[in-house]
Amino acid sequence: MRSVTSFNDSWVFSEASTRDAERSGRVSRSACRTNAVELPFNYFDERCYQRAFTYQRVLAWRPDFSQGSRSSSTRQWPMRSCISTAKRSSRIRDGYTPFEARLTDRLLEGDNLITVKIDGSENPEIPPFGAGIDYLTYAGIYRDVWLKVTDPVSIANIKIETRDVLSDHKAVSLRCDLSNPQGLSFSGTISALLKNAAGEVLAEVAGETTGQSLAFEMDGLRGLSLWDIDDPVLYVIEVELRTGQGFRLLRRAFRLPHGEFTTEGFRLNGRPLKIRGLNRHQSFPYVGLRMGRTAKGSAHADIMNAHRLHCNLVRTSHYPQSKWFLDHCDRIGLLVFARNPRLAAYRWGGMETGGNPERPPHRSSATGTTRLSYIWGVRINESQDSHDFYAETNRLARELDPTRQTGGVRYITDSEFLEDVYTMNDFILGNEELPGANRPGTALRPQQECTGLPRKVPYLITEFGGHMYPTKIYDQEQRQAEHVRRHLEVLNAAYARNPGISGAIGWCMFDYNTTRISAPATGSAITASWTCSASPKFAAYVYASQCDPSEEIVMKPVTFWARGDDDIGGVLPLIVLTNCDEIELKYGSLTKRVGPDRENFPHLPHPPVVIDHRHFTKDELGVWGMKWESAEFTGFIAGKPVADLRMAADPVPTTLQVEADSKTLRREGRDTVRLILRALDQAGNVLPFLNDAVDIEIHGPARLVGPARIVLQGGSGFLAGVHGRRRHASSRSRRRGSAAAKLDLVALADGAASA
């Protein structure tokens, strides 16, 4: 391989028609913006991006373009694009899977104008369109672009499979596919090294090739560690191709896990593991899908797993997601349920399911062959049955990777079961409120009621909650407490001593912009445990509190601590989401210590503490018109205090906090970091109903994403800046003063070789 370099920078953009761009020959820089459309936070017309746009960039001739090399532009998921140079063009009718546009023999000496024409309109022949969908498909080049210069014969792909991972002598199967578009005659050598994280060579194989793919076996491997959620050990396969025309080196990280869904639940490396996860959309305020590597990669994965939510699985909704996010999931020990892009017409039964082998499920499956998640979604989300089509998607997935189980997400009962795992969106909780409902509130239905099968099968809940009880971060306290209780009830049912359920994946992680067929008035779905501006709702702590205290001690009272927020008045019953043994509440001169509510939530690893009139009488906490006091909460483990929290009776704005997801940004390409603003009271708690405006300033060679003045929602706000050499962001509110965050640029160059 000669080089793979970032091709993200120096693009100019035009809202002019593609015909106008071709006529002018080049888009004027003074007339362009970085984004096709910058969306308001809410209340916007989704049709604003459903039209044609043009991106252009000059590629200067380089000597290595002519030395028998092949040049191509690799794009990760632009929405339905046509790429052209002065000589020819390439076309892709898919917004979700990566592709290469070959530039070999198209480049001229001198400056070459690369034109990318984006069609953001909804075409029913292109997934996911065809009927209604409940998310937005933002137009534009919203992920990374690479310029790849290779030898005429190069490595096209590495496919890695692991075998016998539970034995002392493990095995790795490797297939190396070659790219030789000119059909050149050659002979060469392919060698492969297996290395650990320290770079030590653990195994080596080699073979001769005259153009065909080569398969290798590395067996009898001793001393290799299994990848685990608590110990995510990664290994590297390094493949080198040497021919008379040169050589190419390709590296691919992989892991050695053993995950299996059984009728007795999910087992990871031979031990039972109850899945606790959330679905994740990858959109952001203002820019949709167009965020840099740090923001859409490590930041989201860390929230899911390591720092905030302590989930062990993420389900990608409803499309293939950023390579950077998936790579980081591997690094931090987060399981992934991979998805195909949803073709809405299949859900509503409005499209024939006959077979073009290059339809998107094929492309998505092929893209994921080296992504060692434990289950593939080979069924279009919540679609009707289609025997021939889904028999083919299952066959294809098993052919591409026989080591991985398949799953098919449905919401209909008694559905044809063609996959290895029956995956079900169970939204039964809340149906008791519908007219004519004749069953009481039910957290989850028994497996066989949903499958209609006479036997138990591997079974996983892939969605629950969500639209059944939409909740805003600034909703009244009792609604938020009910939101919390519903998540608790479903997780409690999933953890019940019923091994037939492998676990449950809630809907969803972040609020997101969606279409009007399912959106609330603002246009943003409020169905998540976090806001779209990355602020946790109370329900987020349902998941966080289930972690072991050795990972993090969690104590979150589900209250704004005010007498007048709840109906009738007061704060009881008061849920405290915690993994502590006991919670002590001090109110005035009174102190009460309460343990977990195992009566109502007997199966959770860490049931919540529920403080009610069994612990405080009406007179002890006072009634309307009596003095309202501040509260102090203390968490105890093994009789020792481990957490404390004070909630003020008279909260006032005191501090404006600025927190960055990362203190570093990458130099190469386009990177973005999220900054979260929070208005805090004198006790350090967020002021949930403060909606003041905050002014933002960015100092240095960086750019603010979104408006320079934001209004706090739920006591918090969101902004993001695209990187420069060094940046300093500050914010100011007239009532609360100012706060600042400083970010420095660092040179972190990794991942390019796998583009």
Curated annotation (Swiss-Prot):
Annotated gene: lacZ
Active site: 382, 463
Pfam family, one: Glyco_hydro2_C5
Gene Ontology BP, a term: carbohydrate metabolic process
Protein's recorded name: Beta-galactosidase
The enzyme's E.C. designation: 3.2.1.23
EC top class named in words: hydrolase
This protein's UniProt keywords: Glycosidase, Hydrolase
GO MF annotation list: beta-galactosidase activity
Statement: the UniProt record of this protein carries the keyword Hydrolase: yes
InterPro entries: Beta-gal/glucu_dom_sf, Galactose-bd-like_sf, GH2_Domain-Containing, Glyco_hydro2_dom5, Glyco_hydro_2_cat, Glyco_hydro_2_CS, Glyco_hydro_2_Ig-like, Glycoside_hydrolase_SF
Family: Belongs to the glycosyl hydrolase 2 family.
Catalytic activity: Hydrolysis of terminal non-reducing beta-D-galactose residues in beta-D-galactosides
